[in-house]
Amino acid sequence: HRDIPAVARIAAQNTLLNRFALEDILRAVMTPDAPHADIAALFAAQKACFASGITRPVPHRLDQLRRLRRAILAHEQDIEAALQSDLGKCRTEAYMCEIGMVLSELGYLLRRTRRYCRDTHVLTPLAQFPARSFIRHDPMGVVLIMSPWNYPFLLTIEPLLGALAGGNCCILKPSKDAPATSAIIRQICAECFPLEEVAIVEGGRTENQALLDQPFDKIFFTGSSHVGQEVLRRAAEHLTPVTLELGGKSPVIVAKDADLTLAARRIAFGKLLNAGQTCVAPDYVLVAREVEDAFVAALQKQFDQLCPDPLHSAEYVHIVNQKHFDRLTGLMASGQIVYGGSIDPAALRIAPTILRNVSPDSPVMQEEIFGPILPILPVSGIDEAIAFAAARPHPLACYLFTKDRAVQRRVLDTLAFGGGCINDTIIHLVTSRMPFGGVGHSGMGGYHGRDSFRCFTHDKSIVKKALWLDLPMRYTPYSKKKETLIRFFLK
């Protein structure tokens, strides 16, 4: 399933790789305990592959994407089983939130990659006449994609699509907390790609550190802000450009004129999805005080309808591990539990929980919740809601429920956040036609669709000068006439 002779040929051309047996390189991606030397060798193999130019032709990129699509379709049930094993995701949620989104992005890029790869021709300034100006969209080189456990298939494969469309070689580092999904991704990559084009390194902190020792041409990281800061610090040692997809406390603002039933239903959906273990999940609600009681009642009703038996429902995801379960149960003490609060420690399940009488200084308001706990904070009006959200680090998302267009404009103009919705939650990231990304503490850079291609390419500006005419005004010695011409052209 791998073109071993191709790897051997590349190894033979690279003096660094001559120190390592091919079996050692293969072991680096096939086992979770790869030594640092093997990771360095794997990186060198991919650098040599990229230097050969094999990943640059557009037909090769499209063939990679088609092979990946066929493999995903062939292994769809295996992917569903892996997501069920790691997180307890039901088949529908696994397809809606992971497999289907990957296939949608794949189709989008298959239809457009050829166009994206074409040089972009631009007008040439008159002062540079005669010449042609154009922008090449060059691959970055060898890229590292580090993904989290909460959407382990989507958040590993979706950035890979942009990297392949951009003509890069890739090393994937999935989370150790989603081992079943990591295993099926490893199998798919082994079937689709030679090692020197796409490889997967499994493991934990040791492997992460060894990977960050390498001078990658691009790093794409999805995860917590704390780890993202460490990735950025390590990348700075090599001046490696980084895209960070982080998180934060994404607020929901419910104005007094909101449709409370619809707002409650859509907020409940956003919080129930993956049991709140979503980087853009509603984190807390700022609700107009005069409608607080009615909104909480509507929210309780929607939780009852959407997930009537959360501790036993096959459609409700469990918490990923004991560490996060203990953290979340500790946060439940930050306010008055007015709904939910039940837990099943053996199954790592926490029912959707509504908290009231929550202090802004309480533990639940100091960190991203990343679970099915929803604090409700009453505010006097839109001014207080905006001031509250603006005083905190920029979140990855913000959600506003109101019919008032002036309020909508004001929130969009005033608050800084990655992206969001008006009168809904979550759905802004379910498109290939808009970028998804954070700002400030919630991340830097974006991807999806064309922005995924841009994320993994470098715009190289080129001026191709004609040989038949060479205007003399730029050359010394300067004269009044030359200065007059320069002033004519440059104004």
Task: Kindly label every feature range from the protein language model.
Residues I39, V58, E76, L260, ...:
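Residues at or immediately preceding the N-termini of alpha-helices
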Residues L126-L262, V379:
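Rossmann-like NAD(P) dinucleotide-binding subdomain of oxidoreductase/dehydrogenase enzymes
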Residues F50, I54, R69-I72, E76, ...:
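Structural signal for hydrophobic packing residues in well-ordered secondary-structure cores
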